[in-house]
């Protein structure tokens, strides 16, 4: 909750993190505040909040993306397709407060939120989400 009388703000007190909404058909514990691009070559920016213990299914996005962790701790596991289905591609990556992660377009991954997280998420062009199996 924001405090408009404070001289200084942070992730706990800034109005940036107010007015988040839930979105149908998204994982439990996820809320966001966003604006949608009017320029088809632009980027889409979302301010995301995830509750500790929330998880995103294995998925991909059609554009490159960048995640900045403002508060909390999360992890990402990349996957690749094989004859036996999806298999982990490398070690699980951990992102902590202050870290920035980049994911290439169409790279298959999951996301797990170890602590309550506040994220700035930037997606190249219009956002898309494809669940992978």
Task: Name every feature range the model reports, one short phrase each.
Residues 47, 70-71, 115:
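A cytosolic small-molecule/anion-sensing beta-strand core signal
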Residues 96-97, 102-130:
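Ligand-binding loop in jelly-roll beta-barrel domains
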Residues 55-57, 72-78, 100, 127:
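Short beta-strand segments in beta-sandwich/barrel cores
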Residues 81-105:
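Short acidic-glycine-tyrosine-enriched beta hairpin
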């Amino acid at each position: 909750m924001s405090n408009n009388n404070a001289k200084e703000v942070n992730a706990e007190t800034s109005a940036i993190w107010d007015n988040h909404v839930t979105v149908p058909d998204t994982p439990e514990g996820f809320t966001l505040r966003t604006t949608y691009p009017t320029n088809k070559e632009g980027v889409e920016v979302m301010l995301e909040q995830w509750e500790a213990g929330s998880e995103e299914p294995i998925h991909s996005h059609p554009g490159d993306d960048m995640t900045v962790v403002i508060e909390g701790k999360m992890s990402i596991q990349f996957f690749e397709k094989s004859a036996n289905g999806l298999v982990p591609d490398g070690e699980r990556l951990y992102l902590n407060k202050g870290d920035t992660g980049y994911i290439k377009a169409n790279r298959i991954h999951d996301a797990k939120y170890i602590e309550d997280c506040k994220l700035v998420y930037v997606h190249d062009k219009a956002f898309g989400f494809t669940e992978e199996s």
